[in-house]
Each structure stands twice: as C-alpha cells, then as structure tokens.
Design a protein with these regions (language model features):
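Active-site nucleotide/adenylate-binding loops and adjacent lid/helix of ATP-dependent enzymes
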Residues: 1-7, 65-69, 110-192, 198-200, ...
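Phosphate-binding site of ATP-dependent enzymes
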Residues: 172-252, 256-267, 290-295
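Short acidic/His/Gly/Ser-rich catalytic and metal-binding motifs that mark active-site loops
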Residues: 12-17, 158-161, 242-245, 308
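ATP-binding N-terminal substructure of ATP-dependent carboxylate-amine bond-forming enzymes
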Residues: 1-100, 107, 111-112, 137-142
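Alpha-helix N-cap recognition
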Residues: 57, 170-171, 321
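ATP-dependent carboxylate activation and anion-phosphoryl transfer catalytic cores
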Residues: 121-123, 256-336
C-alpha cells in the first residue's frame, strides 16, 4: 500500500518541542520534523511504500495532492499557511477529492478547536468541565458565575499557545489586563475564561474507533513547580528551556492511580473522544482534583506523534512499540 505523509513545510525543528525547545514563532507553532521522519521510517518497516507530500501554504501545492498516486494519506497538517485555524480545511479537501486519510475529519477538528463549544458538548454528555464564559471585544457571553482564581486563554488555540503563568488571575484588574493582552496578541480572537482547577494534569491517549481504546494514562507532574507558580502546562513548562518550571516538570505514566479512578478517567476520555467526533487517534486532557473530581479540559485531535511525545509514551505503556502504534492508526483509517 502506498502511503503519502502529508505535512506543511515551515521552519523545521529537529527536536520534539514539548520536551526540548521553544516552538513558538509569533502566534503559530511548528510541527517537529522528527514527527514525519519517524512516521515515514515506521511505515517502511511495516512494508508500506511511504512518500512525502509537502504543502507550502500556496493553493498549487494543495491542488497537487489530488494528483498523488497513493492509497492513503497520513495527515500531519495542523495548520495551513501558518494558520492553525485552517487545519480543518485540509481533511475537508481530502474528502472532496475522495482521498482516504488518517485522523479526525473536519467536523471533529471544528468541534475540538472551539473550546467553548466543546465544553458545552462535553457537559451535555454528563461530564464535568470547569465553569466558563467567553469574552469578545465589547461583549461577554456568560455561561456560569465563576469565582477567582480563573485561567484566561484563547478560545481556539492549542499546544499551550497563549497560556503562561500570567494566565491564572486572582483579581478583576489582572483579569481585564489579561483579556486585553490576548485580544491584542491574537487579533481579537475570543477569550475563554475558566474556573481554575487545582489538581493533577492527566492526559489520556485514545487509539482506534470501534471501539476506541484508552491507553495508559500519562501525568504531567507539576508538583515540583515553585510555590508561587500556578500548576498549569503553560509556555514556561513546555517550551522555556531556561526556566525552572521547565526543568522540574516531566511526563510519565501515572502509575499511582487506583483502578477505579483510572477507569473513570479513561471512560471520561473515551466519552469525550466520541462526543467530539474524533477518530483514529487523539488525546484528551483532564484535571483530577484533590477530592477525586474529574474535569475534562480539552481535546487534541492531532497530538504530536514523535517517539518522545506523550501519545507514544502511552503506547509504550500498553506494551506497544512505536511501529505498532503507527500500524494501528493506519489500520483504523483504512477500516473506515
């Protein structure tokens, strides 16, 4: 089977951004070069015929995809023309030309991208999510009464873009300043204000479709952060190599959770995955509070797939090799 590894060409980074370096380039992020290279190598080991298909943000490169002689496209495009908000148009185009591809479709990407809408859907399915409201310039959409502390972030960004230690606010003055800063930085993108939940940062990798499987849970351990630092996975934790927050945090399989709590977290993740129409693979981010309450924070339909990323870490925890993980993603897409 011929498989085209589809990606957008931007400045490459040789390392996994979540672990090794700052990936922010203005507003947008760069997908790691190793992501596509490791997937390509895994596809070769599996006996497939992989090839690279490159987008460069110009329409000609997109239209050329229709002429590619491949049986499946392994879609690694999470932006178009450097704009993350346009990632859903790539699978929409692939469907228009009748191409098979891995990962979530445009519907799932849209639902996951709009955090406010996703929270409403998650709540409808009986899951807990932090109380929130959305602020536009000159207008506030109230959902609930929220108490301080709050966390303030763009409503439609991912990869911790727009989130830093300053995102957690404790007063009206700090709240208004943060809203203003985000509206300036993100060109009037609506701002999501959420109740800040103190607790453990849990990631659930989901693999497959009918039924989806929740892999072993991963925890980003924030317990060693300085006392005056909010326990969030912001820029300092993920990308700022010179910060203490970066040095003292790490992800690992959450081995100390009891069986009942683990099952509840995995079920919440699978419910979220299905409710938001995700498919083939994805990651659900949650908070586990001190009293055992599970809060679904957001869904990531296209998490990084490098060997050092949390998704591959979870796959290893289930005794899968990296190559087996890629094989199952391919098989899930082909079976649809």
């Amino acid at each position: 089977m011929k498989i085209g590894v589809l990606y957008e060409q931007r400045e490459d980074t040789e390392e996994y951004p979540g672990e090794n370096q700052d990936i922010e380039s203005g507003r947008r992020r760069k997908r790691p070069k190793l992501d596509r290279e490791q997937i390509y190598d895994a596809l070769e080991k599996l006996g497939y015929e992989p090839s690279y298909i490159q987008l460069d943000g110009r329409d000609a490169s997109l239209f050329a995809v229709a002429k590619e002689d491949v049986d499946l496209i392994f879609n690694l495009v999470d932006s178009y023309g450097g704009d993350d908000a346009k990632d859903l148009h790539i699978p929409a185009f692939l469907e228009l030309i009748g191409a098979k591809y891995t990962g979530s479709g445009p519907h799932g990407l849209l639902l996951a991208q709009d955090k406010s809408l996703a929270k409403k859907i998650i709540g409808f399915h009986g899951l807990q999510t932090p109380f929130s409201m959305v602020v536009h310039r000159g207008r506030v959409d109230y959902a609930h009464d929220i108490k301080f502390p709050m966390i303030v972030k763009p409503v439609s960004e991912d990869g911790s873009i727009g989130i830093s230690n300053d995102s957690v606010v404790d007063s009206v003055k700090e709240l208004m300043e943060r809203i203003h800063d985000l509206h300036e930085q993100f060109e009037d993108v609506p701002v999501l204000i959420e109740e800040y939940i103190e607790g453990r940062e849990i990631y659930a990798a989901i693999l497959g479709n009918d039924p989806p499987e929740a892999l072993p849970l991963i925890e980003l351990d924030l317990s060693k952060l300085p006392a005056d630092t909010p326990r969030i996975a912001g820029r300092e934790v993920k990308f700022d190599r010179d910060s203490e927050a970066y040095r003292v945090t790490k992800s690992a399989v959450a081995e100390d959770l009891d069986e009942k709590t683990t099952e509840k977290l995995q079920e919440a993740a699978k419910t979220t995955y299905r409710a938001l129409k995700l498919r083939d693979y994805g990651r659900i981010d949650m908070r586990l509070s001190k009293d055992g309450t599970i809060y679904v924070i957001e869904a990531n339909p296209n998490p990084w797939l490098t060997k050092g990323a949390e998704f591959a870490m979870a796959a290893r925890g289930s005794e899968r090799t990296y190559t087996q993980m890629i094989k199952e993603i391919v098989e899930a897409a082909v079976a649809r």
